[in-house]
A protein has these predicted regions:
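Membrane-embedded helix-loop-helix hairpins and adjacent transmembrane boundary segments
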Residues: 1-461
Length: 461
């Protein structure tokens, strides 16, 4: 156990050290928010995959694998598919906009009020995703090391806040690459093979596990559809994802490195689902399936390897927490504070650091108060997709879209999502379905009844 603690200490110090190094590279606002738009294919692939694959993708997919077998991969598969489509279909338009936030696109195409409303929704989304990741830090360390949940959240979340505040996107890029390597080794080369071997191999797993555990449809077509609506479309419009696109040095990097990141995500989902299925063989009576990742780590790994695999989980979690923290802070600063609350304010690194720190404190407070990771993630994606998908995609693809249609669409989609969550529960499939239908119907009807907006314009270098 001492060796595991030493590994975790080295990991934490490395993250802080990379954050300090990133601070030295962040000389301008562009450096802090989008790494100067200078990332090549290697750095871009690693940082894109790292921000997508967080606590829900790792711990949540192992949990789904424990409950449903291989079909637990669908959540992460849809995220990967969204990254692929975003990279191949929309990358050229997005890269040429030369903006910092998704919701700046709403103002460019529609009007200022759509940027404000969209910004509020986007801040709520990114903050909630950061909260789910921070909660997962506490869950993993509590189960594996016996550290109480709240101190673990404060310690792990505090590290995320420090390196995010001091170095911005450059710190996130450097830490993401190390985290990408750690979780690749920890998941694919250590935990996956040792879990399957501990369960007696794939053949024995097929014999022992309930029927359907190796059927890709076992989780249910309705759940697969919900994952498609939430996570595929969520990947298309999330600020945390777009902000990584803005870091690339060229459209070619976005296209091909993004394709690689999407494929990596799909393979990662399959690996985590198989780990969960192996945990079901070895630990069939877990009272809390969400602890499957931590429990199988304790069950099959020796000291040292256990520390590496816990570091892999924390790498996945912290990369998403930091990415969404910076995304929420960027939208709050660019789309709300500097644009509406204090118009004319000159954005600089000091302001960015203060707002990032403010959002980090909010992240820690909420993480200490909220317990259910999947519920919090569902709220975030329901609001994001139900409220913003239609007007953002419409801004890119539909010339007839109007400002009034965009605003009405955001409001109608969010209200429908909130009403359905209140009526049917946070984990129900209905909120995203009715939210999208309300958003789309309102967008089309109001746009056709009003004057269309001007087309988007590429911005100068």
């Amino acid at each position: 156990m001492l060796l595991d603690y030493l590994i975790m200490l080295v990991y934490a110090l490395a993250m802080l050290g990379l954050g300090w190094y990133g601070m030295r590279k962040a000389k301008s606002q562009s450096d802090f928010l989008v790494a100067g738009r200078r990332l090549g294919p290697g750095l871009y692939l690693g940082t894109m995959a790292a921000v997508v694959l967080g606590g829900a993708s790792t711990i949540g997919t192992v949990k789904l694998g424990y409950q449903f077998g291989l079909s637990g991969l669908w959540l992460v598969f849809m995220l990967g598919l969204g990254i692929i489509v975003l990279s191949l279909v929309f990358s050229r338009q997005i890269a040429r906009l030369r903006v910092f936030t998704v919701t700046q696109v709403l103002e460019q195409r529609y009007q200022a009020s759509s940027r404000l409303i969209g910004g509020v929704v986007m801040v709520a989304y990114d903050l909630m995703v950061a909260v789910t990741a921070t909660i997962a830090i506490g869950s993993v360390t509590e189960v594996v090391f016996g550290i109480p949940r709240i101190p673990a959240i404060l310690c792990g979340g505090g590290i995320v806040i420090v390196y995010s505040v001091i170095g911005g996107m450059w710190s996130l890029t450097l830490t993401d690459i190390i985290q990408f390597v750690i979780k690749t080794v920890g998941i694919f080369l250590v935990l996956l093979p040792l879990s399957i071997d501990g369960a007696g191999g794939l053949a024995r797993m097929q014999e022992v596990l309930p029927a359907g555990f190796f059927d890709l449809g076992h989780i249910g077509l309705d759940t697969i559809l919900t994952y498609f609506l939430l996570y595929f479309f969520g990947a298309l419009i999330g600020q945390d994802i777009w902000q990584r696109i803005f870091t690339a040095r060229s459209e070619t990097v976005v296209r091909y490195a993004g394709l690689g990141a999407g494929i990596y995500c799909m393979l990662y989902g399959a690996a985590c689902a198989l780990i969960g299925a192996a945990a079901r063989v070895l630990l069939p009576d877990l009272a809390v399936p969400e602890n499957a990742y931590a429990e199988i780590t304790r069950e099959v790994l020796a000291p040292g390897l256990r520390g590496l695999v816990v570091a892999a989980a924390l790498s996945a979690i912290m990369s998403t927490a930091s990415g969404c923290l910076l995304a929420a802070a960027t939208v709050l600063q660019e789309d709300i504070y500097a644009r509406f609350l204090r118009p004319g304010t000159t954005s600089d690194i000091r302001l960015s650091r203060c707002i990032t720190l403010l959002m980090g404190v909010a992240m820690l407070v909420l993480a200490c108060l909220v317990n259910d990771v999947i519920a919090a993630l569902s709220i975030a994606y329901n609001l994001l997709v139900g409220g913003l998908l239609v007007p953002i995609v419409g801004a890119l693809l539909w010339r007839r879209a109007s400002p009034q249609g965009a605003i009405a669409s955001i409001v109608a989609g969010c209200l429908a999502v909130i009403a359905c969550m209140a009526r049917d529960g946070l984990l129900a499939n209905s909120p995203i379905v009715y939210g999208l239908l309300a958003s789309l119907a309102t967008f089309v009807a109001v746009s056709l009844a009003t004057r269309p907006a001007a087309s988007l314009r590429a911005q100068p270098e």
